[in-house]
Amino acid sequence: MKKSKHLKRPYLKRSHLKHSDKASSFKGLLKKEDNVISLENFKPKESEDLLENFSNKKDMQELLGLLNQFILQSYKVEKEFKDYKALYEWVIEILPQAIWVVNENGSFFYKNSLANQSHEVFNKAKLENFNTEIEHENKSYLVQQNSIQGKQIITATDISAQKRQERLASMGKISAHLAHEIRNPVGSISLLASVLLKHANEKTKPIVVELQKALWRVERIIKATLLFSKGIQANRTKQSLKTLESDLKEALNCYTYSKDIDFLFNFSDEEGFFDFDLMGIVLQNFLYNAIDAIEALEESEQGQVKIEAFIQNEFIVFTIIDNGKEVENKSALFEPFETTKLKGNGLGLALSLQVVKAHEGSIALLENQEKTFEIKILNAS
């Protein structure tokens, strides 16, 4: 903040003055306020004339002592002022808000560093006369304004995270409700499709198989939605990694794709502690994403997906490698309901991250020549 150009000089208590005739003349130049004496009325010319009248050495020493005390107090007050100013500026800087202090003529009296980075937010809010919510660069801001001592104090708070949580909570409730409503009719259709398959001839059988695959996909989305809305809790049991590989190969037969893709599975013969059903969902999500990434390529290149699983120290490690389309928006990779795929719902990776965290693990997109996802979960009972 700007320093005031007219700071009052520090005051001296009256008790500091000695009572002598000539010193009392000097007191006449001082201003008395609430039993405190200041030098506001001290004029250089008058002080020179007064000093010439001090013939007594003792009086001169009294005056010099008084001035010395005043100087020391001035230094002390100046230091305190600078310390308080630095403290206030530090507090304002660490606040998670952009802060502008505006003069009556519209010029800026003060701005913190966040305000310096938020000119467009200020300009948009100004058009709305402040005290509003605005959207800027995919973020939401709450702008508030107040007036004090002829100045406007305007703050802009980033409420994007709060808005996102509200949106996710609302979408989660709606999705869970829809999943429950859809589940029963889908179950009935699935049962009828099974009956239809038994009576289908060679010509209609492939159609019924594709119908079953589509129904299986719907059921999988319903299951993922319900899991996401309820929260994840891992029930770890001792399982073979090879069994997980077999389950993944079976799930692959239920997924529809058009390109020629090689699938390379390399799961070790070891056993580990994990939730078999939940980790099966996670690996299916990454396997299907790899297939979709290969399908998204315009070139008719031979697709390849490699999936490995092994135990490394206290972790079970899974790697999924594919030569499909690169990840476009890495920052939103695990955001719920965020997807760039036409047939995606944006819950696959978000749910996968929840499952992995429930296993005290992590997911990383490695910066290799090939697109590689690495999943690590704690191997603990």
Curated annotation (Swiss-Prot):
InterPro entries: HATPase_C_sf, His_kinase_dom, HisK_dim/P_dom, HisK_dim/P_sf, Sig_transdc_His_kin-like_C. PROSITE patterns: HIS_KIN. Residues 177-381 form the Histidine kinase domain. Disruption phenotype: Shows a pronounced survival defect at pH 2.5 not due to the nonmotile phenotype. It is an enzyme of class 2 (transferase). The modification Phosphohistidine is found at H180. It comes from the Bacteria. It catalyses: ATP + protein L-histidine = ADP + protein N-phospho-L-histidine. SMART domains: HATPase_c (SM00387), HisKA (SM00388). Its EC number is 2.7.13.3. Autophosphorylated. GO terms for molecular function: ATP binding; phosphorelay sensor kinase activity. Keywords: ATP-binding, Kinase, Nucleotide-binding, Phosphoprotein, Transferase, Two-component regulatory system. Member of the two-component regulatory system FlgR/FlgS that induces the transcriptional induction of the genes needed in motility and flagellar biogenesis. Also plays an essential role in bacterial survival at pH 2.5 independently of FlgR. Functions as a sensor protein kinase which is autophosphorylated at a histidine residue and transfers its phosphate group to the conserved aspartic acid residue in the regulatory domain of FlgR. In turn, FlgR functions as a transcriptional regulator initiating transcription from RpoN-dependent promoters. Interacts (via its C-terminal kinase domain) with FlhA (via N-terminus). PANTHER family: PEROXIDE STRESS-ACTIVATED HISTIDINE KINASE MAK3, SENSOR HISTIDINE KINASE. This is Sensor histidine kinase FlgS.
